[in-house]
UniProtKB/Swiss-Prot annotation:
The gene is ruvB. It is found in: Cytoplasm. Its main location: cytoplasm. Residues 3-193 are annotated as: Large ATPase domain (RuvB-L). It comes from Streptomyces coelicolor (strain ATCC BAA-471 / A3(2) / M145). This is Holliday junction branch migration complex subunit RuvB. Residues 267-357 are annotated as: Head domain (RuvB-H).
Amino acid sequence: MNWDDTTDAEAAAERLVGAAADGEDQAVEAALRPKDLGEFIGQEKVREQLDLVLRAARARGATADHVLLSGAPGLGKTTLSMIIAAEMEAPIRITSGPAIQHAGDLAAILSSLQEGEVLFLDEIHRMSRPAEEMLYMAMEDFRVDVIVGKGPGATAIPLELPPFTLVGATTRAGLLPPPLRDRFGFTAHMEFYGPAELERVIHRSAGLLDVEIDPTGAAEIAGRSRGTPRIANRLLRRVRDYAQVKADGLITQEIAAAALAVYEVDARGLDRLDRGVLEALLKLFGGGPVGLSTLAVAVGEERETVEEVAEPFLVREGLLARTPRGRVATPAAWAHLGLTPPRPQSSGNGQPDLFGA
């Protein structure tokens, strides 16, 4: 299947192991979402630090500092923003960077906030530059200048804002300009989850969804969930379907493995796209190095899809390396696919010849 380079986010959402949320995820996550920091599983350091920030703000009777949460999709940034609002007993307004393309869009949102309200701005790195610049003043001074008129006759009318808490979320913190990053009083990076934490997530979700699962079934799903709770919950739902149709409803290790084999998610969490990239790299190019464009053609995908959808997990798992000369498979990639690496050929000086010539 081919995806246009403007639809990589949609491509990631369509994959069973994609971290982007689809419509079903959003509906189910609302029911599974923890309501306070005590219910939130994982991210121990972030929770501990955030708890101190919120407790101190409540003790002072003040709004909480602005919060910046960074990390991969599916790790709980939206959930934490809602928990912040709940802990502060404040309403929450949710929007996203792509929805704010003009300073006027942001001014309309800010001017309608209540005192103490939490504004959650997802994908904050995708906000327009004029809106970013307006946000600087709003975060620091709780006011914005609204421009009335055009040209030499334009005037700036200051608009006072009630104190509010901005919670920004981003998957690409490096794209945020320093003046914006510096205005957040608390910043945290969300880490990928370990297997034990994911098993706890799966058991909790299974209880809320009234799904029977034993520890071996939870461990099997956790091992294929790429360190991401959203993926773990999605795999749990698909395995539940299989268990209800093909078995007695109880999810065991055998049932989970059989179900995920049907959905082409292997023991390490790779799907058909991931394995296609690795198989092309190993079988067609001897493990590389090979250029990204050439590899994409061999796989039958767009360059951007290979680079942005498939490669990040393969690199994180130590199966593929990005080098100045191209993509190279690691020994772990050969082992995972059960293939034997070619023996390096020697040149006349007795040294291995990189090009096999």
